[in-house]
Amino acid sequence: MGNTVAREDFEWVYTDQPHADRRKEILAKHPEIKALMKPDYNLIWVVMLMVAAQLTAFYLVRDLDWKWVVFWAYVFGSCISHSMTLAIHEISHNSAFGNGRAMWNRWFGIFANLPLGLPYSISFKRYHMDHHRYLGGDGIDVDIPTNFEGWFFCTRFRKFIWIVLQPFFYAIRPLCINPKPITRLEIINLLAQLFFDIVIYYLWGAKSIFYMLAGSVLGLGLHPISGHFIAEHYMFLKGHETYSYYGPLNLLTFNVGYHNEHHDFPNIPGKSLPLVKKIAAEYYDNLPQYNSWIKVLYDFVMDDTISPYSRMKRQLKGEVKQD
């Protein structure tokens, strides 16, 4: 478990990200894909059901023994929580109400955030738009690990710990790489979350709060669904920046595994990304792809050529516009 990864820096590239050019090519050849660029109103009802499911779980765990609270936090709560972060990802792209009602999406994102326990939705939206516009951009794309992460988490054991601690690095990384002024909506997100947490504690006590927070932390750390964090952009094959996953966990994650398709068409809801792949199969079928996020996690830890440094980075040119 002590083998050290030889890579000592990111993979610096001097070309633009591939998604804009591929999008133009696909739309020229398959203009019918434009019909998929519309809201997914079913997302609204799915999110409401997920919030209701977590509220029910908060009530049911309130008097359980602690061992069962921990058990259900990992077995059930972690899945719902991670799935909810990906619903928030969909909402950040205005998939719930459409681009014409952008603020409705922001308020709905704050609502979807409530059963996670920690404010997330508004800040995520701001940084995630940068990730799409400036994929791999040095000092802008906070999906890229810090130099410390690449340098320190360089053995199998340390990479395993890095996976466990993923939620903490995703929370801290923006402050290190690209800090932004706090906005009014972020303050509202924080206050709404604090109020919700206080109400849950008042109604059902510490075990419900623990279940909520533990489910979020565990679901974003050492968990099968968390394989998507690594599968999406870590360079397992030299020269390939984005990878899709076509396995069954897409059913729980709003098709976030269709990641090449998503970056090519970020304004198409996850529900319709399989149709994008079907229509433009000649563009996607031969790209590197995964069928198991668990295997991605295993390979990341055990492959001594892969580390947090295994990301493509680029120096941005021209004016950079951020949210």
Swiss-Prot record:
Where along the sequence does the record place the motif called Histidine box-1? 89-93
Q: Which family does it belong to?
A: Belongs to the fatty acid desaturase type 1 family. DEGS subfamily.
UniProt short sequence motif Histidine box-2, positions renumbered to this chain: 128-132
- This protein is called Sphingolipid delta(4)-desaturase DES1
Motif Histidine box-3: positions: 259-263
Role played? Has sphingolipid-delta-4-desaturase activity. Converts D-erythro-sphinganine to D-erythro-sphingosine (E-sphing-4-enine). Catalyzes the equilibrium isomerization of retinols.
Q: Which InterPro entries match?
A: DES1/DES2, FA_desaturase_dom, Sphingolipid_d4-desaturase_N
- Tissue specificity note: Expressed in retina and retinal pigment epithelium by Mueller cells (at protein level).
> Tell me, how does this one assemble?
Interacts with RLBP1; the interaction increases synthesis of chromophore-precursors by DEGS1.
Q: Which GO terms describe its cellular component?
A: endoplasmic reticulum membrane
Q: What is its EC number?
A: 1.14.19.17, 5.2.1.-
Q: Which organism is it from?
A: Gallus gallus
- Give one GO molecular function term: retinol isomerase activity
The way it spans or sits in the membrane comes to: Multi-pass membrane protein
Reactions accelerated catalytically: an N-acylsphinganine + 2 Fe(II)-[cytochrome b5] + O2 + 2 H(+) = an N-acylsphing-4-enine + 2 Fe(III)-[cytochrome b5] + 2 H2O; all-trans-retinol = 11-cis-retinol; all-trans-retinol = 9-cis-retinol; all-trans-retinol = 13-cis-retinol
Give the location in the cell. Answer: Endoplasmic reticulum membrane
Transmembrane domains' residue ranges: 41-61, 68-88, 102-122, 159-179, 185-205, 209-229
Q: Which UniProt keywords apply?
A: Endoplasmic reticulum, Fatty acid biosynthesis, Fatty acid metabolism, Isomerase, Lipid biosynthesis, Lipid metabolism, Membrane, Oxidoreductase, Transmembrane, Transmembrane helix
Biological process GO terms, please?
A: ceramide biosynthetic process; fatty acid biosynthetic process; myelin maintenance
